[in-house]
């Protein structure tokens, strides 16, 4: 039996509530030693994070990775910018998309794949308040149908 390759570390549940996700993309994250140890311990928060393109490189901003308990003086800054490992074509495409008004590039989840930390980033357009209410209403209707018909 094949072993599970992806190990989910953190998920940004609020992102799908606040944005219409148009496309997703997998990227590696350049982390220091104490950061990867904290990530493996699931001490990461994606809630306020976003991706920014600066000088042809993609950076993960405002993602909190807690300090490693045994890291002593070699610990990292919890909110530092972390470089995303993407191909140039992918970065250029994201830069064009980011230039559009109302488009955000946000981290959706962080997971380990074959021992490497990966982040699934999504290109999303912000939802208005009535869109959020409509989504909740549709979800409740689907839940009622499942209960009624036992699907």
Curated annotation (Swiss-Prot):
SUPFAM superfamilies registered for this protein in UniProt: Small protein B (SmpB)
Annotated CDD domains: SmpB
Location(s), subcellular: Cytoplasm
A GO CC term attached to the entry: cytosol
First-listed, main subcellular location of the protein, grouped into a coarse class: cytoplasm
Entry keyword Cytoplasm: yes
Pfam families from the UniProt entry: SmpB (PF01668)
Entry GO MF terms: RNA binding
Keywords: Cytoplasm, RNA-binding
GO BP terms, alphabetized: trans-translation
Entries under PANTHER family matching the protein: SSRA-BINDING PROTEIN, TMRNA-BINDING COMPONENT OF TRANS-TRANSLATION TAGGING COMPLEX
Family: Belongs to the SmpB family.
UniProt cross-references to NCBIfam families, sorted A to Z: PRK05422.1 (NF003843), smpB (TIGR00086)
Entry function: Required for rescue of stalled ribosomes mediated by trans-translation. Binds to transfer-messenger RNA (tmRNA), required for stable association of tmRNA with ribosomes. tmRNA and SmpB together mimic tRNA shape, replacing the anticodon stem-loop with SmpB. tmRNA is encoded by the ssrA gene; the 2 termini fold to resemble tRNA(Ala) and it encodes a 'tag peptide', a short internal open reading frame. During trans-translation Ala-aminoacylated tmRNA acts like a tRNA, entering the A-site of stalled ribosomes, displacing the stalled mRNA.
Record's protein name: SsrA-binding protein
The species this protein was found in: Lactobacillus acidophilus (strain ATCC 700396 / NCK56 / N2 / NCFM)
Gene designation per UniProt: smpB
